[in-house]
């Protein structure tokens, strides 16, 4: 009982049931031309009062279930000859999911600025996932879950979107209460602001593509903790809410409301502020962080500096 609907769980330990579900994906998803979908749930196997075909305890099988669900999707795509042409994203996973899951998303965050289940939570969530081998992650822009009087604001939506442009996958979601949550189409100003952010995301594509390729080749996540490239910096190990977007960019998302400035920590390097061109050499700094200009920096000697400079020329602070 999900509160608003009922559902059942197919016993994926049963080979016939596994093949049946795989055929459903082939026929009714791939078969009608769909090349991307949300492979939702995966974590709802009951832990008591059921008997599985495998004979294993559901308590033991519970954490393995997301792997079976990912494998079912993966094999459907592979057997249809569409690996590399199809992306499905999942919210549940663990050891073993890495081979079968093409993309993670962070699940159903609250539509707010709370530290443990709002915007901030997807930052450290992406870093944790990346360090366990799931290097391609993203989240619902604006969050998903509205309960009681908790509703998405315009500011939250835009702060989330400005972070999402520095992730491998940028995707909006209306949330579970579309009529009461702020949507990008609610006013012209937001549509213009979002169009700018999406264009930046598009301009970054040559750089982002190399990060995705690196993830496939070496396993390095697209979003990385600072200590991954600055091992000798003791402070880097304490930073949870900033991340390296590949080797050459550092992003410090604004995850609190009503902020116009933001404190940032930069490891020792030659950094250039994406929006102003101001140069920094590392350490603790405070920078302007107006809506739409989340603190973002790139390494001065990056081979992609021309792209970053083009972004500043088109959308930077004049």
Which positions does each model-derived feature cover?
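Catalytic-domain carbohydrate-binding cleft regions of carbohydrate-active enzymes
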Residues: 1-309, 315-317
């Amino acid at each position: 009982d999900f509160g608003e609907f009922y559902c059942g769980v197919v016993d994926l330990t049963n080979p016939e049931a596994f093949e049946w579900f795989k055929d459903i994906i082939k026929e009714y998803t791939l078969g009608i031309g769909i090349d991307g979908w949300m492979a939702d749930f995966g974590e709802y196997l009951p832990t008591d009062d059921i008997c599985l075909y495998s004979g294993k305890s559901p308590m033991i099988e519970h954490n393995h279930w997301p792997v079976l669900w990912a494998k079912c999707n993966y094999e459907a795509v592979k057997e249809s000859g569409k690996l590399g042409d199809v992306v499905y994203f999942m919210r549940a996973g663990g050891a073993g999911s890495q081979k079968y899951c093409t993309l993670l998303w962070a699940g159903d965050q609250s539509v707010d600025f709370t530290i443990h289940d709002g915007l901030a939570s997807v930052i450290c969530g992406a870093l944790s996932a990346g360090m366990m081998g799931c290097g391609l992650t993203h989240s619902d822009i604006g969050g998903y879950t509205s309960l009681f009087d908790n509703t998405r604001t315009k500011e939250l939506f835009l702060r989330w979107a400005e972070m999402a442009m520095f992730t491998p996958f940028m995707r909006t979601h209306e949330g579970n209460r579309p009529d009461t949550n702020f949507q990008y189409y609610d006013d012209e100003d937001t549509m213009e602001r979002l169009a700018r952010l999406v264009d930046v995301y598009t301009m970054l594509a040559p750089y982002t593509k190399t990060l995705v390729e690196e993830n496939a080749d070496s396993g390095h996540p697209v979003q990385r903790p600072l200590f991954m490239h600055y091992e000798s910096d003791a402070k880097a190990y304490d930073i949870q809410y900033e991340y390296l977007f590949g080797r050459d960019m550092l992003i410090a998302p604004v995850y609190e409301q009503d902020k116009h400035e933001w404190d940032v920590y930069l490891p020792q390097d030659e950094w250039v502020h994406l929006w102003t061109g101001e140069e920094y050499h590392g350490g603790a700094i405070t920078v302007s962080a107006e809506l739409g200009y989340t603190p973002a920096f790139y390494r001065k000697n990056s081979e992609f500096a021309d792209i970053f400079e083009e972004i500043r020329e088109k959308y930077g602070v004049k």
